[in-house]
Amino acid sequence: MHSKPQWLRAKAPTGEVFNETLNIVKLHNLHTVCEEAACPNIGECWNKRHATVMILGSVCTRACAFCNVATGIPDKLDPHEPENLAKAIKKLNLKHVVITSVDRDDLPDGGANQFIQCIEEIRKITSETTIEILTPDFLNKKGAFEAIAVASPDVYNHNIETVPRLYAKIRPRARYFHSLYLLKMVKQINPKVFTKSGLMVGLGETKEEILQVMDDLRSAEVDFITIGQYLQPTPKHAKLDRYVTPEEFEHYKYIAYSKGFLVVASSPLTRSSYHAEEDFNRLKACR
């Protein structure tokens, strides 16, 4: 594995606010992608009381080559999860929350109804909190993402993750064009919802392939793109091809804005929910 360049060195997670956030998460039996996916930004985010909550359990039914989340046979759904989530958000006094999940291909709806219940419970308990969801593709199960779009989260994020050529290696159980279709249909079903998608770089993709993904996302009317460095979690995961320089990320940001995205986040440490509240405010200002 490559040694990390200086620009990817994040501060170790410490501090009183960090520990308070951790305690609230544990008290309400919540999982976070910050912990499960070993996010490098956990220290910065949790010290701001920003946490990305992961619903539907902590075990994924897929084994994507880039992801550090545990895979296997998941537990049954927790019926108290939506209420526990809403209470934790209120206790953390979050103005903006990001909710993601593992893939649950074992469920008839892929877990879509649990997303909807979480949205409804948050609006009941802490109505001022804006809601951003980051969903899987639900294995193209009929009516799944459509029902969530109708529930009207403020932001609907679904990550494209990588370029089409690398899907068989990186996301073998997903389909590039289904992800584009999902994003396009969410916008058609509920035009007031902001749509968002993320792309990892450093897996062997070319600049031309990245620009094509940008064009495809704009054709699907996606408002916001995030571009970040792939970091290989363990030696068994997809091999890192290279570290993309900060200057290249700035170049991609410039190009993405020129293609019509309302907001672009592009840097080595950019992740889907990194600075999500600030970026949501930027999105609102663009409308």
Curated annotation (Swiss-Prot):
Signal peptide (from-to): none
Subcellular location(s) per record: Cytoplasm
Protein's pathway: Protein modification; protein lipoylation via endogenous pathway; protein N(6)-(lipoyl)lysine from octanoyl-[acyl-carrier-protein]: step 2/2
SUPFAM superfamilies to which the protein is assigned, alphabetical: Radical SAM enzymes (SSF102114)
UniProt keyword list: 4Fe-4S, Cytoplasm, Iron, Iron-sulfur, Metal-binding, S-adenosyl-L-methionine, Transferase
Main subcellular localisation: cytoplasm
Listed cofactors: [4Fe-4S] cluster
E.C. number: 2.8.1.8
Binding site for [4Fe-4S] cluster 1: 34, 39, 45, 273
Catalysed reactions listed for this entry: [[Fe-S] cluster scaffold protein carrying a second [4Fe-4S](2+) cluster] + N(6)-octanoyl-L-lysyl-[protein] + 2 oxidized [2Fe-2S]-[ferredoxin] + 2 S-adenosyl-L-methionine + 4 H(+) = [[Fe-S] cluster scaffold protein] + N(6)-[(R)-dihydrolipoyl]-L-lysyl-[protein] + 4 Fe(3+) + 2 hydrogen sulfide + 2 5'-deoxyadenosine + 2 L-methionine + 2 reduced [2Fe-2S]-[ferredoxin]
Metal-binding listed as a keyword: yes
Pfam families for this protein: LIAS_N, Radical_SAM
Keyword Lipid metabolism among record annotations: no
Cofactor note (record): Binds 2 [4Fe-4S] clusters per subunit. One cluster is coordinated with 3 cysteines and an exchangeable S-adenosyl-L-methionine.
Entry-linked InterPro entries: Aldolase_TIM, Elp3/MiaA/NifB-like_rSAM, LIAS_N, Lipoyl_synth, rSAM
PROSITE patterns: RADICAL_SAM
List of residues binding [4Fe-4S] cluster 2: 60, 64, 67
PANTHER family in the record: LIPOYL SYNTHASE, LIPOYL SYNTHASE, MITOCHONDRIAL
Protein name: Lipoyl synthase
Source organism of the structure: Wolbachia pipientis wMel
Gene: lipA
